[in-house]
Amino acid sequence: MFFSQVLRSSARAAPIKRYTGGRIGESWVITEGRRLIPEIFQWSAVLSVCLGWPGAVYFFSKARKA
């Protein structure tokens, strides 16, 4: 049963592979880019808040004194 499913799947994938240039689906780089870009933005936002809040406090307290 399992082997017949594997054979059917590989028989279907072989003609598709000829037309797609050697791979089924999108490139690994595109997949990882879609996954990592939001995480990089979130990481940079958290890092900016953690490191930048003292500067923001200093800037806004200085602006109100003047």
Swiss-Prot record:
Mitochondrial intermembrane topological domain residue ranges: 65-66
GO-annotated cellular components: mitochondrial inner membrane; mitochondrion; respiratory chain complex; respiratory chain complex IV
Function, as annotated: Component of the cytochrome c oxidase, the last enzyme in the mitochondrial electron transport chain which drives oxidative phosphorylation. The respiratory chain contains 3 multisubunit complexes succinate dehydrogenase (complex II, CII), ubiquinol-cytochrome c oxidoreductase (cytochrome b-c1 complex, complex III, CIII) and cytochrome c oxidase (complex IV, CIV), that cooperate to transfer electrons derived from NADH and succinate to molecular oxygen, creating an electrochemical gradient over the inner membrane that drives transmembrane transport and the ATP synthase.
Topological domain ranges for the Mitochondrial matrix compartment: 9-27
Family: Belongs to the fungal cytochrome c oxidase subunit 26 family.
Self-association state and partner proteins as the record states: Component of the cytochrome c oxidase (complex IV, CIV), a multisubunit enzyme composed of 12 subunits. The complex is composed of a catalytic core of 3 subunits COX1, COX2 and COX3, encoded in the mitochondrial DNA, and 9 supernumerary subunits COX4, COX5A (or COX5B), COX6, COX7, COX8, COX9, COX12, COX13 and COX26, which are encoded in the nuclear genome.
Source organism of the structure: Saccharomyces cerevisiae (strain ATCC 204508 / S288c) (Baker's yeast)
Topology in membrane: Single-pass membrane protein
Keyword Methyltransferase: no
Transmembrane annotation, as ranges: 28-64
Localization terms from the record: Mitochondrion inner membrane
Listed name of the protein: Cytochrome c oxidase subunit 26, mitochondrial
Designated gene of the protein: COX26
Keywords, alphabetical: Membrane, Mitochondrion, Mitochondrion inner membrane, Transit peptide, Transmembrane, Transmembrane helix
Signal peptide span: none
Tagged with keyword Magnesium: no
Transit peptide, residues from-to: 1-8
Classification lineage: Eukaryota, Fungi, Dikarya, Ascomycota, Saccharomycotina
